[in-house]
Regions:
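Exposed, interaction-prone assembly regions rather than primary DNA-binding/catalytic cores
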Residues: 88-173
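Generic detector of well-ordered alpha-helical segments enriched in charged/polar residues
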Residues: 13, 38, 42, 109, ...
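Short loop/turn segments at strand-loop or loop-helix junctions that form parts
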Residues: 55, 161-165, 196-198
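Surface-exposed alpha-helical segments enriched in charged/polar residues
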Residues: 14, 42, 46, 110, ...
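Generic surface-pattern signal
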Residues: 46, 72, 76, 80, ...
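Glycine-rich loops and low-complexity Gly/Arg-rich segments
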Residues: 75-79, 85-89, 218-220, 324-327
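C-terminal regulatory/effector modules of DNA-binding transcriptional regulators
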Residues: 175, 179-333
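Basic, Lys/Arg-rich alpha-helical nucleic-acid-recognition elements, primarily the DNA-binding modules
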Residues: 1-84
Length: 333
């Protein structure tokens, strides 16, 4: 198979070498032309450059020896006499449990580091640090949905979780071991949860809304299930590239002050105003849990990447009939 530089196949091959095993869903993060990326993926598979791992509810891929040789050949041909840096061949696995875990860790790294250019450390790197420091029970990290940490400019931390299609449970032991790493940080902020589709985000919000209307036992169950409470106030991000600008900007210098100013301006207007500008949904859920008058006017201010989630909420009848949505834009760098 002939691979041309600047083609979708070359981009896909490079990402497969740099990131390692990835879920099929990660193709949506590689450029705006998804159909072209899918076509390139099929060609690379037919050429034997990528190998697919399948199981019910899971599909991932990794670069083969032939694919890695093709990558090296294209890179050396393009740079000829220069001393080109060539990545080592990443490992892939056919073990389904390991494939699910590894591909999600790698997809989160792809999203935060390559796409959003944030300071980020994977859970595997954190696990190795814990082992060097003789922290006990690090093996249970592999059973959790914890995939890494984001650092901001002052090295504050956001723990990151990957919920896949939304139907996930977090392992309490894995959660505790993740907390060991956070204990040495200056401050820990909200959890960031990656979810593949807007529909899956709405599934989680629907469950949380149900739990908020129940008693304390249901709330305890909610914490064990999704680990999203008012105290956590987790940031939910769709893994489709639309949240790239938000991830690049949030928690930078003056971010919180700027958001507070925008919210104050909007909430000064008549009627009820709910804000999603911090990436969190608990303010809206708390309002909906009170079962307000569906005809009452309410204004929801949100970023452009949250519009698809709000659309699904409206389609499912979870938003008040007269709810108006104000959209704010962020430009990716």
């Amino acid at each position: 198979m002939r691979i041309c530089r600047n083609s979708a196949a070359w981009l896909l091959l490079q990402v497969s070498v740099v990131c390692g095993q990835l879920p099929y869903h990660a193709l949506k993060l590689l450029g705006s032309n998804y159909a072209r990326t899918q076509d390139a993926f099929q060609k690379l598979c037919r050429a034997g450059y990528l190998e697919v791992v399948k199981a019910p509810g899971h599909k991932s891929y990794f670069v083969t020896d032939a694919g890695f040789e093709a990558y090296c050949w294209v890179l050396q041909k393009a740079r000829r006499k220069s001393n080109a840096f060539i990545w080592g061949k990443p490992t892939g696995t056919h073990n389904i449990e390991k494939a699910v875990r590894l591909s999600r860790i790698n997809e989160a790294w792809l999203f935060f580091v390559l796409l959003c250019r944030r300071k980020y450390q994977t859970s595997l790197q954190i696990k190795r640090e814990q082992e060097r420091k003789a922290v006990r029970s690090t093996d249970s990290l592999k059973y959790s949905r914890f995939v890494g940490c984001i650092y901001n400019e002052e090295r504050f931390i956001h723990p990151v979780y990957h919920f896949g299609n939304g139907n996930q449970r977090l392992n309490p032991n894995g959660e505790k071991n993740a907390a060991v790493r956070l204990a040495g940080a200056m401050m820990s902020f909200e959890k960031v949860i990656l979810i593949e589709t807007p529909e899956a985000i709405v599934d989680i919000l629907d469950y949380l809304l149900w739990a908020l209307k129940k008693d304390s036992h249901a709330l305890r169950h909610m914490r064990l299930n999704f680990h999203i409470t008012w105290e956590d106030n987790a940031i939910l991000l769709p893994l489709d590239g639309s949240a790239q600008a938000f991830v690049q900007h949030f928690d930078r210098k003056d971010w919180r002050a700027g958001i507070a100013q925008m919210e104050e301006q909007e909430k000064g207007k008549a009627g009820i105003t709910l804000s999603l500008l911090r990436g969190q949904w608990m303010e809206l859920l708390e309002y909906l849990a009170r079962e307000p008058d569906p005809e009452a006017p309410v204004r929801i201010i949100a970023w452009n990447f949250q519009q698809s989630v709000l659309r699904v909420l409206r389609e499912r009848g979870m938003l008040p009939t007269k709810a108006r949505i104000g959209m704010c834009l962020l430009q990716a760098e």
